[in-house]
């Protein structure tokens, strides 16, 4: 029987909320948390918290990849970012957290992958799409940029 997998974080003020959580569903409406509702993966690098994750399966290798925004409000909102979303947008991480698995159970150690440049602010909300015509993957994300004085976000 097939199931849907929901890869998500929880909006909580404690560090365990900004980690990778899994839930499964048979119908896409009724969900059951896995791992007793505790994080399946923990972020130990960068901001030590992750949000906005996406999962993709590599067509060639069959491996699963999770990419996530490197951001922890529970650890950094007060001290690192002075309670300011603008400061996060300007000074947040330009890396994405990344994990790899063959079976959705056993995962690699977290890897930080640099996507942003020095002209960008925080790299947010990644997603991955497969271009079947060219057999390539495209990772895109949102970020503020120096070219518009770090105003509106753009998608890269």
Residue spans for each PLM region:
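Beta-rich carbohydrate-recognition and catalytic domains
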Residues: 1-123, 129-156
């Amino acid at each position: 029987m097939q199931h849907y997998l929901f890869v998500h974080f929880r909006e909580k003020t404690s560090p365990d909320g900004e980690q990778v959580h899994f839930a499964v569903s048979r119908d896409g409406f009724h969900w059951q948390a896995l791992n007793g509702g505790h994080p399946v993966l923990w972020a130990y690098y960068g901001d030590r918290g992750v949000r906005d994750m996406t999962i993709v399966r590599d067509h060639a290798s069959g491996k699963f990849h999770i990419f996530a925004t490197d951001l922890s409000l529970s650890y950094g909102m007060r001290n690192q970012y002075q309670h300011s979303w603008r400061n996060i947008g300007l000074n947040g991480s330009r890396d994405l957290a990344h994990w790899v698995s063959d079976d959705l159970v056993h995962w690699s150690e977290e890897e930080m992958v640099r996507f942003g440049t020095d002209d960008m602010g925080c790299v947010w909300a990644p997603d991955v799409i497969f271009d079947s015509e060219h057999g390539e993957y495209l990772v895109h994300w949102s970020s503020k940029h120096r070219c518009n004085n770090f105003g509106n976000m753009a998608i890269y």
